[in-house]
Amino acid sequence: MKKLSKLRLPLIERELSVLNEEELRAYIGGQKQSCVFNCFDYLDGNLHSANDYYNWTKQGLGYEPDEHGNVDISDVGTIGGYGGFNVSKVNSGESFILRSDGQTSNGERVMAVFAVGSESNEEGHAVVISGFYRTDDERIVYYYYDPTSLCSGSILSDDCDSLYLVKHENPNT
C-alpha cells in the first residue's frame, strides 16, 4: 500500500470542501437530540424526523434542548403540534382506558415522562407506552418503548411524572 507523503495532505485539504457547523448539521442531522423529539418521530411513523421537531422548536419556541436533551415540559403539546399531533396532558386523578396494544380506547398513544438520574441531578426522559399489566397488589406497570435508546422496559405508573395522550390529526399520513 502506498504511503501518502506529508506534502500531499495540504493539497488534499485544499481540494476537499469544508462545511461550517450549520451546513454539517443540515447534511447529517446533527442537531441536539431530545427524547421528546424522538418520541414524536417514532409516533408519526417517520413522517417527520427528530431533526424536523428540533428545527420547529428552535424556530417556533426560540430555544434548543439543553445539553441533556431536555425541553420545557410545558412545550410538549406545542412541539407535538408542529408534527400534526393533538397532545393533551393527563391531569392528576384523570383516567383513561389503555388497551393491551398500548393505545387508548380513542386510538391515542400514551407518552410518559419520568425522572432519571440521582435525586440531586434528576432529568426527565420521555418514552412511548406500549402496554401494561397489574401486579398482585393492583399496582399498574407500564411497558414502554424508548425511541432514544432503542430499547424496551417497564415502569410503575406511580413513577411517571407526566402522561400525555397523543393522536395524529391525520392518521392516514
Question: Where does each model-flagged region fall?
Answer:
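N-terminal secretory leader/proregion of peptide precursors and effectors
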Residues: 1-30, 85
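Intrinsically disordered, low-complexity regions of eukaryotic proteins
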Residues: 15-17, 23-25, 43, 110, ...
